[in-house]
Amino acid sequence: MLTRSILSVAVCGLLLSPLLPITRASQEEDTGKQDKQFTVELDPETFDTAIAGGNVFVKFFAPWCGHCKRIQPLWEQLAEIMNVDNPKVIIAKVDCTKHQGLCATHQVTGYPTLRLFKLGEEESVKFKGTRDLPAITDFINKELSAPAEADLGEVKREQVENLNIGKVVDLTEDTFAKHVSTGNHFVKFFAPWCSHCQRLAPTWEDLAKELIKEPTVTISKIDCTQFRSICQDFEVKGYPTLLWIEDGKKIEKYSGARDLSTLKTYVEKMVGVPLEKTAGEAGDEKVVIEEVAGEEDAAKKLTPQQLTGEDEFDQAIAEGVAFIKFYAPWCGHCQKLQPTWEQLATETHQAQSSVKIAKVDCTAPENKQVCIDQQVEGYPTLFLYKNGQRQNEYEGSRSLPELQAYLKKFLGHDEL
């Protein structure tokens, strides 16, 4: 068994793996409030297999432990959130009263002990944060998005570095799926005849040059006039469309300014690695063609407003009606809701409604306090605000018609 450093924490959080059996709740779940258990329960026979197959966040506990009992609902909630296909991390637990040898091997000396076992790493990571969902998810996001995971495959890292030769990767129908299947990719979907695409082209090339030393992301492009099926699969409806793709899945549609500095800042945010500025960039980064700026302003109105920080959040909810999605980029349910949320924003704007459709990334450090203040306990959480006052949490169906019907309750008869 690989030797791993121990991460003890009084917080609970684990991801459910579709590859591992879900067992009945142990004595820890003695309240009987939940019939279904989402956390994966491990034993000596399944533990090594689990950590050898992926990232695993383990809670080592004892059923009689009061702190363990208090954290149990939060642990189950995190497991339910992460219960998606191909999860980035498995949320699990080990009953140390049943498996004393296993807990002794991992140097468990107190309960609960929380340790993150990262795929390919010999040492586990100890969670030392507060026992709330934002702190735990922030920990997971930081640990699993960090490039330190490279030692599980220097070969994989070298392959990515070979692509980052200072040029945009030109993708085709034959190469697209394999290229984006693992890692981070910023992809431009374009048409050769599109004037905005033509203006963006040199900046896109410059962005690739800036990332020559950053192996965690590639800058790519695909011609939608030649490879329509790929563009249709990613719901591309206009040119250029810039999508952030992680491990083959669309995470976010970029809708910011298209100058080099702003694009670099966006990449830095997504990969969590500061990028160097180029000489003369400070003077050039604010030069934006008026036509493109106007187009981007219109595009922003058709997409959910990305709120950042307490001041921006307070301003958004101060007047009128604001429908806000609190989410985490790694959350599978959030990813499934994303296209519907974008469509809701588009149709709301087209109906000339005054309601604001927005979103808050709770894993971003600048939003941590916002999500704590708003008592966000799971992802996605949908709150509606009217003149600064929060209404009841929306817990209905996440289909577009149901979301629109909910909004109508708070709007005038002529809206939506």
From Swiss-Prot:
Keywords: Disulfide bond, Endoplasmic reticulum, Phagocytosis, Redox-active center, Repeat, Signal. One of its GO terms (biological process) is positive regulation of apoptotic cell clearance. Belongs to the protein disulfide isomerase family. This is Thioredoxin domain-containing protein 5 homolog. It is found in: Endoplasmic reticulum; Cell surface. It holds the Pfam family Thioredoxin. Disruption phenotype: Reduced level of apoptotic cell phagocytosis. Loss of both Prtp and CaBP1 does not cause a further decrease in the reduced level of phagocytosis seen in either Prtp-lacking or CaBP1-lacking embryos. One of its GO terms (cellular component) is cell surface. Residues 1-25 form the signal peptide. GO terms for molecular function: protein disulfide isomerase activity. A motif (Prevents secretion from ER) lies at residues 413-416. Residues 26-145, 150-272, 293-412 form the Thioredoxin domain. InterPro entries: PDI, PDI_thioredoxin-like_dom, Thioredoxin-like_sf, Thioredoxin_CS, Thioredoxin_domain. Disulfide bonds join 65-68, 194-197, 331-334. It comes from the Eukaryota. Possesses thioredoxin activity. Acts as a ligand for Drpr and is required for the phagocytosis of apoptotic cells. Binds to the extracellular region of Drpr and augments Drpr tyrosine phosphorylation. It comes from Drosophila melanogaster (Fruit fly). The gene is prtp. SUPFAM superfamilies: Thioredoxin-like (SSF52833).
